[in-house]
């Protein structure tokens, strides 16, 4: 339940608008509300981090509005809470009116939801399930440079799950569409909320089965097999992609060293 922030309120401050995050001095604000001119703002507590409250304030600031990607090097728990705040702020902003009857909506006091004041329809934040998979062939891992990542970073393959599709089917389809190969021995590893914009990454490892690499140029700039001890530039630590790569490297080391 939201409330008006007072002078002595303190904690972590997620100030967000239109999927942007307020980052004074490039950092997520922490401390007393008065230090950040937040007294009098309406805020919603969205969690706790190390015993301190994490507050969401839906507001556009004139300066220092950036991407949640800029705080990806925070502790994972705090980064995920910042991502939750950005996603909730966008959810509340985009659900002011009911999509069925057009009447004004209001936030639920008991859950992350918006309620219609007229037809009683209930809306929840949209979450887009995605798969991400590390594919191993002997002592090598398949890594690709995506068209949206023109910074030299190579990563594993990923994509959105389609309507009526299982996670396993999504892995097989995405891998075939993007790289032209087939995989086998699919194993679930972990999951990670990913606020770009509202994804839930489900991570897998798999073994190469058959086929030659034929990339989809709309998705990839290039893809290739890289030996575990001679890898290109990788995603930053803390991402599920980096974990999958490191787990695959560990398997290769155990077998080939």
Curated annotation (Swiss-Prot):
Family annotation (Gene3D superfamilies): 3.90.79.20, Nucleoside Triphosphate Pyrophosphohydrolase
Enzyme nomenclature, EC number: 3.6.1.-, 3.6.1.22
Molecular function as annotated in GO: magnesium ion binding; manganese ion binding; NAD+ diphosphatase activity; NADH pyrophosphatase activity; RNA NAD-cap (NMN-forming) hydrolase activity; zinc ion binding
Binding site residues for a divalent metal cation 3: 174, 178, 219
Residues where a divalent metal cation 2 binds: 174
Gene Ontology biological-process entries: NAD catabolic process; NADH metabolic process; NADP catabolic process
SUPFAM superfamilies: Nudix
GO cellular component: cytosol
Reaction(s) catalysed by this chain's protein: a 5'-end NAD(+)-phospho-ribonucleoside in mRNA + H2O = a 5'-end phospho-adenosine-phospho-ribonucleoside in mRNA + beta-nicotinamide D-ribonucleotide + 2 H(+); NAD(+) + H2O = beta-nicotinamide D-ribonucleotide + AMP + 2 H(+); NADH + H2O = reduced beta-nicotinamide D-ribonucleotide + AMP + 2 H(+)
Residue sites binding Zn(2+) per the record: 98, 101, 116, 119
Hydrolase found in the keyword field: yes
Keywords, in A-Z order: Hydrolase, Magnesium, Manganese, Metal-binding, NAD, Zinc
Cofactor requirement: Mg(2+); Mn(2+); Zn(2+)
Cofactor note: Divalent metal cations. Mg(2+) or Mn(2+).
Motif Nudix box mapped to chain: 159-180
Residue stretches making up the Nudix hydrolase domain: 125-248
Entry binding sites for substrate: 25, 69, 111, 124, 192-199, 241
Record: residues binding a divalent metal cation 1: 158, 178, 219
Functional summary from the UniProt entry: mRNA decapping enzyme that specifically removes the nicotinamide adenine dinucleotide (NAD) cap from a subset of mRNAs by hydrolyzing the diphosphate linkage to produce nicotinamide mononucleotide (NMN) and 5' monophosphate mRNA. The NAD-cap is present at the 5'-end of some mRNAs and stabilizes RNA against 5'-processing. Has preference for mRNAs with a 5'-end purine. Catalyzes the hydrolysis of a broad range of dinucleotide pyrophosphates.
Assigned protein family: Belongs to the Nudix hydrolase family. NudC subfamily.
Oligomer status and interactors: Homodimer.
Protein name per Swiss-Prot or TrEMBL: NAD-capped RNA hydrolase NudC
């Amino acid at each position: 339940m939201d409330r008006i922030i007072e002078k002595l309120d303190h904690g972590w401050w997620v100030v967000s608008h239109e999927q942007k995050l307020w980052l004074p001095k490039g950092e997520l604000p922490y401390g007393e509300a008065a230090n950040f001119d937040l007294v009098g703002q309406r805020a919603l507590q969205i969690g706790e981090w190390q015993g301190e409250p994490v507050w969401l304030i839906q507001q556009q600031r004139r300066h220092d509005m950036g991407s949640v990607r800029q705080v990806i090097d925070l502790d994972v728990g705090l980064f995920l809470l910042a991502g939750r705040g950005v996603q909730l702020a966008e959810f509340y902003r985009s659900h002011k009116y009911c999509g069925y009857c057009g009447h004004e909506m209001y936030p639920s006091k008991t859950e992350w939801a918006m309620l219609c004041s007229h037809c009683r329809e209930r809306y929840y934040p949209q979450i887009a399930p995605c798969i991400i998979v590390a594919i191993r062939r002997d002592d090598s891992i398949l890594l690709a440079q995506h068209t949206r990542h023109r910074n030299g970073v190579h990563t594993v393959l990923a994509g959105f799950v389609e309507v009526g599709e299982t996670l396993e089917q999504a892995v097989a389809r995405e891998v075939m569409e993007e790289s032209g190969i087939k995989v086998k021995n699919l194993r679930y590893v972990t999951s990670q909320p990913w606020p770009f914009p509202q994804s839930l990454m489900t991570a897998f490892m798999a073994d190469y089965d058959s086929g030659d690499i034929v990339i989809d140029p709309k998705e990839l700039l290039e893809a290739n097999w890289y030996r575990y001890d001679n890898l290109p530039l990788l995603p930053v630590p803390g991402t599920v992609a980096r974990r999958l790569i490191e787990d695959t490297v560990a398997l290769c080391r155990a077998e080939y060293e």
